[in-house]
């Protein structure tokens, strides 16, 4: 048996988040790490590159994803600081193993931080 970890962006999860209910139903102790930057980041990056300063329809009004997970019967936590990530992940990993239920770690991240050393603005620039 292996630990399954799912990494999803907020826009991605909003399109298929109801699958969390299926994971609860079948008691699948998966770990969902949800990265919330409040936007459809990839779409925004392409818009910035092709139509500078004319971004449209990429901002998201997100729910409390930890509460969303709990509403389905799973477990969830929200972190806002990097130093809180590892302890929260370990707590949720232990909880998933103990309860045989899915868990979700809702991570609020900087919308500009898309990858180490690169911002969404620099990634959108043509090189």
Question: At which residue positions do the language-model features occur?
Answer:
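Thiamine diphosphate
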Residues: 1-127
């Amino acid at each position: 048996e292996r630990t399954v970890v799912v990494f999803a962006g907020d826009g991605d999860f909003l399109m298929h988040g109801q699958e969390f209910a299926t994971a609860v139903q079948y008691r699948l102790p998966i770990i969902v790490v949800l990265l919330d930057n409040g936007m459809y980041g990839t779409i925004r990056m392409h818009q910035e590159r092709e139509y500078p300063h004319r971004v449209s329809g990429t901002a998201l009004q997100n729910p409390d994803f930890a509460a969303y997970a709990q509403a389905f019967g799973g477990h969830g936590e929200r972190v806002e600081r990097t130093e809180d990530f590892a302890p929260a992940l370990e707590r949720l990993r232990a909880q998933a193993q103990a309860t045989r239920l899915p868990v979700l770690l809702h991570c609020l991240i900087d919308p500009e931080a898309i990858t180490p050393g690169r911002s969404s603005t620099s990634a959108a620039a043509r090189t």
